[in-house]
Amino acid sequence: RGLLRGLIIRHSSSTGETLVGMVTNKGRFPRGFLSDLTQDKNLKRLGIVGLIQNINSQNTNVIMGSENKVLWGKNRYIESLGGLTFHLSLGSFFQVHSKQAEKLYNLISQWTEEAKGQTLIDAYSGSGGIALWLAKQGRNVIGIEKFEPAMEDARQSANSNGLSNCQFITGTVEEHAA
């Protein structure tokens, strides 16, 4: 049983930013490993903006644990899509194929055209991609997601895009259905 369990690389083709996550068991990296790995010039040349250790000591098929340590740089990378800026952390959900995401978001925007003036629910919101897209179109949206780091990403993205017509609630859809 070694230290490294997996590697997660999240990259934005629109901004060139890359966030790297090393999923590990509990333990320490070999002496000198982190100092060699985190030399600014090498990471910046590759577009890496953050290097994160995610600790998962559970003997399951769950990929990520709940504890993150920033080893170098930032804990989020930036994705740009359709004039919006998204702040994304290692474990929060965002569509992987940005061109298809834009098509999907535009389709959802068309479907919700008749709901202008009503409040829409983005259930299982992830990092808020759909909610933010609809808010940019003038819709009032509430995003609901169980994973708190994703909600933090969504709130930061809403704030940086100047969107006040969306809010993000942590919890399950069932907890907030009324």
What do the PLM-derived regions correspond to, one by one?
Residues 29-178:
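Rossmann-like S-adenosyl-L-methionine
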Residues 6-10, 78:
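Short, surface-exposed charged micro-motifs
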Residues 2-6, 72:
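Short amphipathic beta-strand starts and helix->beta connectors
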Residues 17-28:
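C-terminal lobe
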Residues 8, 19-21, 93:
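Short aromatic/hydrophobic contact patches that present stacked aromatics
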Residues 11, 22-24, 88-90:
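Flexible glycine-/small-residue-rich
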Residues 16-18, 117-118:
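Nucleotide donor/acceptor-binding cores
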